């Protein structure tokens, strides 16, 4: 989960056999207590299920494709998470999946997120 500027708020790493919508439920429950200021989350159609909507008091707005869309089109809000993934993958350690455990993968994602924040702070200082 990231804010509209691409800063990481919450991370949840799980195995590849977990569907996005199923992984969203524990993520939203975790974020509810830690980030009570979040009122609305934007998501793609993979998260359009009643189970996700009922998991939290955070409003879920599904950003759908345009009706007349053909080919690739940048959608408002959907690209923010993908951009954050691209920034995180610039970290050499995250370029490939070297981690043996989910805990270590999560830790390195948080470390990469912290480095992004430090770079932003240094840029504005």
Q: Where are the model-predicted features located?
A:
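Polybasic low-complexity intrinsically disordered regions
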Residues: 1-57, 61-65, 109-113
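Basic, amphipathic alpha-helical segments enriched in Lys/Arg and hydrophobic/aromatic residues
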Residues: 62, 71-125
């Amino acid at each position: 989960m990231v804010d509209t500027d691409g800063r990481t708020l919450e991370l949840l790493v799980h195995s590849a056999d977990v569907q996005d919508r199923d992984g969203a439920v524990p993520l939203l429950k975790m974020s509810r207590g830690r980030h009570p200021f979040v009122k609305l989350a934007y998501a793609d159609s993979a998260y359009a299920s009643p189970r996700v909507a009922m998991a939290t008091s955070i409003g879920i707005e599904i950003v759908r494709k345009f009706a007349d869309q053909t080919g690739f089109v940048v959608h408002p809000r959907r690209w923010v998470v993908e951009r954050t993934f691209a920034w995180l993958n610039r970290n050499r350690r995250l370029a490939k999946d070297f981690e043996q455990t989910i805990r270590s993968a999560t830790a390195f994602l948080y470390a990469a997120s912290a480095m992004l924040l430090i770079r932003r702070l240094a840029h504005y200082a």
